[in-house]
Each structure stands twice: as C-alpha cells, then as structure tokens.
C-alpha cells in the first residue's frame, strides 16, 4: 500500500491545501472549539461539513466491524450524486475527508485544478475505482505531500499513525458519515441546513462516548471564510 505523510489537523494548513486544490477562497477550514450549543454558535456560517479526527482504538475497531456486519445485510439507497470513495493510500484519510466535504456541496465553487480534474475523471467510477484513481494520481500525491510537510508535527512516513479523518455532510436531508475505510456511506438520520451543525456535533459526541478515556479528538468544519 502506498503511504503518504499524514496531514496535521491544522486549520490554516488544511485551508491552504483546499485552496491549492482549487477550492474558492470564499471557503476555509475552521476549528470547532466545543460541541455544546453555545460554542457551536461561534462557528462561521454557513457550515458545509464537519471533519472529525479520532483515534482508531480497539473499542472503535470493534464498533466498526459490528456496524459493517449490520449494514451489509440491508440494501440502503443513497442519492445518485453522493460522492463517496474508498481509501487505499495509507495516511490519505485527511485528503479523502476534504474531498468528501467539498464534492458533496455544490455551493462550494472549485476552480480548474487538481481537485476538479479528479472529480470529473472519477464521476462515473465506483467508490473502489475512485480510491485507486487517487492512489495513482501523481498531482494529488505531490500536493498532499507538500502541504503535509507544513504541519506543526512532521510525522515520518514509517511512523504508525493511529488517528483517522472522516467527513460528515448533509446530503438531501440525510446526515452522512463518509469514511474511506468503510465499504459504504453511513447514514446518521435526518438533518437540515438549519440543524446540521447540532446534528453533526451529536455524531461527534457519539464517537467520543465510545472511548470515554480517550481525549485525542479534533473537530474541524468546512465553512465560509472569515472576513
């Protein structure tokens, strides 16, 4: 498996990254400093996605396996334009979460560049084929590596990274968890433009509740850029 340098959960670096990929400067990645109602009010609006970084603990891996076995028995329907891709490149989860966040929000303008080219090239492909396409995309690899090196902690490629990024988005009134390590998108119930922030925060709290002794969680959001 190809290994990339892991991205830091640094909103400034991630904002620079999405802009380099072609996302309009009108959008940025922002820290979510708390998940209670009063702190959620501080997040710049509109909020188009939550990005959660969490530890892949034994408890979480057990939950993931049980969830997979439960959902694979059900033929769930998803919107045709839900963009979902698998992750086959080690440490690419940050990039995959950003792709999921941007690609599932038509309001987020993307100029011609690496990301737009990738989305157009993979539009008709399966989630697995999209993951393989990213693995072979030399431009995406180069951009990821360049920005990953700007993080506050330059983790070496051979280090074992136990944290993982996922995206939470509102797609046609359903809150989706998009995780390239999983075989399919995960539905977390109904949501709306007005309730998305609180609904996504609730899902983040559920991740934290599964590992009550763990503190290594980071929550970010794709939002309108602050003026």
UniProtKB/Swiss-Prot annotation:
Kindly list the residues the record flags as site (Important for enzyme activity): 179
Q: What is annotated as the active site? A: 93, 164
Any idea what this protein is called? Ubiquitin carboxyl-terminal hydrolase
Enumerate the GO terms in the molecular function aspect: cysteine-type deubiquitinase activity
E.C. number: 3.4.19.12
- Write down the Pfam families for this protein, in alphabetical order: Peptidase_C12
Source domain of life is: Eukaryota
Which residues are annotated as site, described as Transition state stabilizer?
87
GO biological process, any: positive regulation of glycolytic process
- Catalytic function, reaction form: Thiol-dependent hydrolysis of ester, thioester, amide, peptide and isopeptide bonds formed by the C-terminal Gly of ubiquitin (a 76-residue protein attached to proteins as an intracellular targeting signal)
The residue ranges of the UCH catalytic domain are 3-224
Its biological purpose: Ubiquitin-protein hydrolase is involved both in the processing of ubiquitin precursors and of ubiquitinated proteins. This enzyme is a thiol protease that recognizes and hydrolyzes a peptide bond at the C-terminal glycine of ubiquitin.
**InterPro entries referenced in this protein's UniProt entry, alphabetically:** Papain-like_cys_pep_sf, Peptidase_C12_UCH, Peptidase_C12_UCH_sf, UCH_AS
Which family would the database say this protein is a member of? Belongs to the peptidase C12 family.
Q: What class of enzyme is it?
A: hydrolase
Q: Which Gene3D superfamilies match?
A: Peptidase C12, ubiquitin carboxyl-terminal hydrolase
Q: Which UniProt keywords apply?
A: Hydrolase, Protease, Thiol protease, Ubl conjugation pathway
- One GO CC term, this protein: cytoplasm
Record-annotated membrane-spanning stretches: none
